[in-house]
Amino acid sequence: MGARNKARKRAVDVLYEADLRGEDAVTLLSGRVGSPDLPPVNEYTVTLVEGVTANRQRIDELLVEHAEGWTLARMPAVDRAVLRLGLYELLWRSDDVPPAVAIDEAVELVKALSTDDSPRFVNGVLGRIAGIGDRLRSTLRGANPGAE
């Protein structure tokens, strides 16, 4: 598993734990950075957790809009964490992470961590959003110049 794959997995772990505990993911992660009892935290993990947290309201709005027939509360918590991370990479990290890679990485994460139905669900939701990704990125940049 490459460094970015590990960073994504660790970010999902933090996002998942924060979601279950009702805590802020950045605060939870900051307690782990530099901890002598835990493995070092990859810089990309920090980037992902901070990015998802900073854009979580918009990410969640997009997920609800494009997860046909699903609410966030109805989704398995792992799927929510992976979708949030995948959507962040898809829309806010597109200069660095090609859309196909963002989707594939998210699907691989849920294959390893969630239900048998999760890969198809995550692929479908992120695929629908990727189809309008250019328009969404343009809108996001207009609302937040310099964001990416």
Swiss-Prot record:
PANTHER family: ANTITERMINATION NUSB DOMAIN-CONTAINING PROTEIN, N UTILIZATION SUBSTANCE PROTEIN B-RELATED. The keyword Lyase does not apply. Belongs to the NusB family. GO terms for biological process: DNA-templated transcription termination; transcription antitermination. The keyword Nucleotide-binding does not apply. Pfam families: NusB. InterPro entries: NusB-like_sf, NusB_fam, NusB_RsmB_TIM44. It comes from the Bacteria. The gene is nusB. One of its GO terms (cellular component) is cytosol. Keywords: RNA-binding, Transcription, Transcription antitermination, Transcription regulation. It comes from Saccharopolyspora erythraea (strain ATCC 11635 / DSM 40517 / JCM 4748 / NBRC 13426 / NCIMB 8594 / NRRL 2338). This is Transcription antitermination protein NusB. Involved in transcription antitermination. Required for transcription of ribosomal RNA (rRNA) genes. Binds specifically to the boxA antiterminator sequence of the ribosomal RNA (rrn) operons. One of its GO terms (molecular function) is RNA binding.
